[in-house]
Amino acid sequence: MEEREERVRDDTIEEFATYLELEGKSRNTVRMYTYYISKFFEEGHSPTARDALRFLAKLKRKGYSTRSLNLVIQALKAYFKFEGLDSEAEKLKTPKMPKTLPKSLTEEEVRRIINAAETLRDRLILLLLYGAGLRVSELCNLRVEDVNFEYGVIVVRGGKGGKDRVVPISESLLSEIKRYLESRNDDSPYLFVEMKRKRKDKLSPKTVWRLVKKYGRKAGVELTPHQLRHSFATHMLERGIDIRIIQELLGHSNLSTTQIYTKVSTKHLKEAVKKAKLVESIIGGS
């Protein structure tokens, strides 16, 4: 009986994943939502708001942050709607997140971090997180074919909300990509692959986090991948680039998400410079 129930539950989770994909959710979101819903049912809960609150209370006691709890609530609400339980979904309220300002790095700190890289691959990872403002998942999903050398752009596929976007990159960054690709001796379609595995699988987010932390320590900076993205936005704004352009480059659907950087930056009145200057100022100091 238990085995049959487990099989039915697995089938339901699979159907839920398909529903999320059809709703346009990113692979990352589908993975996280199905993970939490699986946990929810593993603990014997039923799809009701009351059981959802019990589940959330337990996670909070375990030390889950408000941000993490928000993600679980979004997963539960999505599942309830999938099951046609809109009234139960409405009972779950998302707590307000405190608006914290992202900590931006100085250009000198970024330079130290880039110069700390031990391989061409690692250097390029850091340069793309900073110089193109990529999310970790976007970086890991990049394929060699997504780099258009003729037009000087990369196609970022399946960003937040499952949206693709085109990001222009500088000549300096294109040269770094060419140099890195020339050093590769595998036929993986992905731009970045795991170095230590015999089979060259695409790079995992966990590896990116580990590398970023490592080079942050070497450069004497407490660092996360998202900080490099934050710094890209802040430094662009400081150089006079219009916030709507930064919004497009970051792949933000709402301008209000990007506008948080106006509170961090203090040099808005500088004359606008070409985007290429941002990366060249880092590489030029190497």
Swiss-Prot record:
This is Tyrosine recombinase XerA. Site-specific tyrosine recombinase, which acts by catalyzing the cutting and rejoining of the recombining DNA molecules. Probably involved in the resolution of chromosome dimers at the terminus of replication. Binds to the dif site. GO terms for molecular function: DNA binding; tyrosine-based site-specific recombinase activity. One of its GO terms (cellular component) is cytoplasm. Its main location: cytoplasm. SUPFAM superfamilies: DNA breaking-rejoining enzymes, lambda integrase-like, N-terminal domain. Residues 7-84 form the Core-binding (CB) domain. It comes from the Archaea. The active site is at residues 135, 160, 226, 229, 252, 261. The lineage of its organism: Archaea, Methanobacteriati, Methanobacteriota, Thermococci, Thermococcales.
